[in-house]
């Protein structure tokens, strides 16, 4: 008889982040704060953010370099569009805080049991989510997988990291996890249905899957993001490059999460759509804080985010630098009110 996941009779997280305070749903327009006279640019949070990412070692990994930045490469082909060096790791740690704020401080929206036993964080990046989750649930074994060894070596005793390509067959035994966490895998997955099928396979009966994704399209509710702006060009750049890379950047726009999760066999499917401001223009204090980190994430290492896709499109280094300068200037201009759409889908494996 297969082991079942612990019952979630006393869930740790709310069904809706709104129960914790103001978070902009996808249907709500973001209310703009008054702009003080003469204050058009916002300095954000500065350059003080520090991140410690000591590498683990593995002889099977190789890296390629584009304009001095390193990218994961498997057999000579880059497997991930974002840089895997320290600058980008710092940006991804900022993104973790930004994404957590977007869920009212929650690490998950699935109603997990207090005595959850084993969790898998797929595509864990710097490992920061897995570490925070392990701290929150000290009795739970947390495994984070990624193709690059950029996780810290000093971690809670109940967390470990493994080198694994989630686009290949997963090596974990069937029905071995209570919860599978999938976050910000946009541009990395050639077959989303297969990804959710793999998650279904390794989950215990009654276990939960959760998929959090962000749109690449930068929008505004008041048309402050102009069609010819660098902000408006951001999404189309990634979408055009995806035709060469082979992995979609329109996960949210094409609604790939919920149908794929349902097709895999999950039940009790829930979905949460929201907006993430990319500078501190909102009037609401919590949304303004989200916007501060949105700006910091977007400008901390813009090069590491866009360089690979720009290189795929044949841009020269000079063209990349000009675009990045324009993008950063527009993000910091408080007259612009940019945001991206977020979607979280969570569901349960039948018992």
Curated annotation (Swiss-Prot):
- Mark out the compositionally biased spans (Low complexity): 1-22
Q: Mind listing the UniProt keywords for this protein, alphabetically?
A: Methyltransferase, S-adenosyl-L-methionine, Transferase
Q: Which GO terms describe its molecular function?
A: methyltransferase activity
Q: Where is the composition biased (Acidic residues)?
A: 31-50
List the residue ranges of the region (Disordered).
1-53
Q: Which domain of life is it from?
A: Eukaryota
Q: According to the record, what induces this protein's expression?
A: Expression is negaticely regulated by the global nitrogen regulator areA.
Q: Name one Pfam family in it.
A: Methyltransf_23
Effect of inactivating the gene? Does not alter the amount of produced r-N-DMAT.
Q: What is its EC number?
A: 2.1.1.-
Which top EC class is named for this enzyme in its record? transferase
* CDD domains (alphabetical): AdoMet_MTases
Per the UniProt entry, what are the Gene Ontology biological process annotations, in alphabetical order? methylation
Q: What does this protein do?
A: Methyltransferase; part of the DMATS1 gene cluster that mediates the biosynthesis of a reversely N-prenylated monomeric L-tryptophan (r-N-DMAT). Seems not to contribute to the final DMATS1 product.
Question: Which family is it part of?
Answer: Belongs to the methyltransferase superfamily. LaeA methyltransferase family.
| Name listed for the protein in its UniProt record | Methyltransferase FFUJ_09178
| UniProt lineage | Eukaryota, Fungi, Dikarya, Ascomycota, Pezizomycotina
């Amino acid at each position: 008889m297969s082991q079942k996941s612990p019952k979630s009779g006393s869930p740790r997280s709310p069904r809706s982040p709104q129960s914790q305070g103001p978070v902009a749903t996808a249907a709500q327009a973001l209310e703009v704060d008054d702009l003080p006279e003469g204050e058009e640019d916002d300095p954000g949070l500065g350059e003080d953010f520090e991140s410690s990412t000591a590498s683990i070692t593995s002889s099977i990994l190789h890296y390629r370099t584009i304009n001095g930045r390193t990218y994961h490469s498997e057999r000579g082909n880059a497997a991930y569009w974002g840089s895997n060096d320290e600058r980008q790791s710092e940006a991804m740690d900022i993104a973790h805080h930004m994404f957590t704020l977007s869920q009212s401080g929650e690490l998950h929206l699935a109603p997990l049991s207090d005595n959850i036993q084993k969790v898998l964080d797929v595509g864990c990046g710097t490992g920061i989510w897995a570490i925070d989750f392990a701290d929150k649930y000290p009795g739970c074994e947390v495994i984070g997988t990624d193709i690059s060894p950029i996780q810290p070596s000093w971690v809670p005793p109940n967390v470990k990291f493994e080198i694994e390509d989630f686009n290949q067959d997963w090596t974990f035994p069937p029905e071995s996890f209570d919860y599978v966490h999938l976050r910000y895998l946009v541009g990395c997955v050639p077959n989303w249905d297969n990804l959710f099928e793999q998650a279904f396979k390794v989950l215990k009966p009654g276990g939960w899957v959760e998929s959090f994704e962000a749109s690449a399209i930068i929008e505004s509710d008041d048309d402050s993001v102009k069609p010819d702006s660098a902000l408006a060009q951001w999404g189309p750049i990634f979408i055009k490059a995806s035709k060469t890379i082979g992995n979609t950047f329109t996960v949210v726009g094409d609604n790939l999460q919920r149908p794929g999760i349902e097709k895999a066999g999950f039940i009790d499917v829930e979905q949460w759509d929201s907006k993430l401001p990319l500078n501190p223009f909102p009037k609401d204090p919590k949304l303004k804080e989200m916007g501060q980190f949105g700006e910091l994430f977007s400008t901390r290492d813009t090069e590491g985010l866009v360089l690979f896709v720009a290189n795929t499109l044949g841009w020269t280094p000079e063209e990349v630098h000009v675009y990045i300068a324009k993008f950063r200037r527009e993000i910091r201009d408080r007259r612009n009110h940019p945001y991206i759409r977020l979607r979280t889908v969570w569901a349960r494996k039948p018992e």
